Amino acid sequence: MKDNLKDQFKEKGKQTVEILSIGTEILLGNIINTNSRWIAERLSELGLNHFRQTSIGDNLTRIREIIQECSLRCNLLIITGGLGPTPDDLTVEAIAKAFDQDLIEKEYLWDQMLEKLTNKITNKNNSSLRKQCMFPKNAEIMNNPRGTAPGMIWQPTKNFTIMTFPGVPSEMKEMWNQTASKYIKNNFSESNIIHSNTVKFCGISESSLSESIDDILSSNKPTVAPYAN
């Protein structure tokens, strides 16, 4: 069954990417998901095929299931959110469960965390903070210069890689620029860079404009997408 799904979803010879945003606050509309837009722009610059974005709440079972689905249809899954110390931060645990892997503590991360938080914590054995040091055994750790929650790059199965980032935009961007961008260029980038131009019209309805340029809209090269404002 899995092999059939892989044949169905993964395009032969193409590297495909999905973005998964985790956090109930996104689904409730409490915050605007700017991370996905920013990452999508970076993927376009790198020439990668990016076909799908998903947002999901802080539920262990649903996160695990969506990660398993993504593993069948894309080569690179970029995840933001759910890396913090609180009980609803479930991303790494869900990833491990999705591939039946154990988590181990990276002790050096705990030492680094204590250095960052020397004047901010009193309990040096804080189990909530230690949670952020737990990763699959073979995961490559992405340093977080702006926060305490590291990310990771991990390949749990053949032709499928997961990257995790904190949900805080400034932390995610710093980690992307410092580590992830170079890794993606070296391992995933293709020559499919999309060049785009914006043409603005005023004083005409969207339907009238569509009729006037119908031959262009129906073409595949270039792809034309009207946006009413």
Question: Can you say where each PLM-predicted feature lies in the sequence?
Answer:
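Short, well-structured alpha-helical segments in soluble
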Residues: E65-R73
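An accessory alpha-helical subdomain
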Residues: T157-N229
